[in-house]
């Protein structure tokens, strides 16, 4: 017998892969819609969506068809040549941003890479300082990590690229004071509309507009990381649109490819002219297959009218979970289908495990926050079943008091 025949997939994972992910708890072999199937044939409702990636769920016909057609026609050419799909996607994203100035796109493979491009654009202004939010997350490559306001993620890899300073998320007074220390040397401010990895945290109302005004006053680039919030996730195509803000640079990934690896860095107006030939690049970024998938995702979101559906469904989920009045639930925060169930105790990992036992995939994004980021095609019926089962999940995650 071969090793494949005699050894479990988990054991093979432990032997063959680096330990940076630990050992995942499930062996998944297939998926359709909002449901995934494990190696033991058990099905799970995926309420995490590959961490906000699978905008249309698993094996969506539009994505499967677009990718199949494209890979059979032209799979990869590098950025030494032009192909129609990458131009079409850049033009489509520009039309969706719907701003008065021209928009230029740089395509890559992930959110971290999109934020690396934004970092370089900021430095091309000739200024060195980049201001980022405490508790923010922008990726694990070195430039993106330098802008990530979570010391535990940075410390193992120090020294970081220099010039990044941090302010409390949502505190415009603190940010203003930081800018005022050296406004002429401040290249950019980078923020997330909602801190997804940081616990699904929203800033105070008007914060993004205040950041925009501050940046405009001092000639500072406003970079908005919409890797997690973009492409309909919060009930708007871009979360910045809800705030009425036009950034200088916006970064995208996750839901854009519907499961295919693609990121985008979009630069508005003069910011789009800062990178010149030879200053940045990527071998696989913007390849025809990933671009075809992204166009299929955008088409489907529009034709199926998913954005108002996401906005409405998110409000239903939040209200119904809070109406359970369960002692382990404090409140629900977030927008659309990027929600954080805030617990009254640091039991998010236990809730994640109990949900898995009950047939649901959710994520612990903080010790006391359970993240929901399901496919945008989630139905009210699926929500109703989850909410009905949630009290049992929460009870199972709650430590039982000793009777001795």
Language-model segments: residues:
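Conserved N-terminal phosphate-binding loop of PLP-dependent enzymes in the Aspartate aminotransferase
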Residues: 2-404
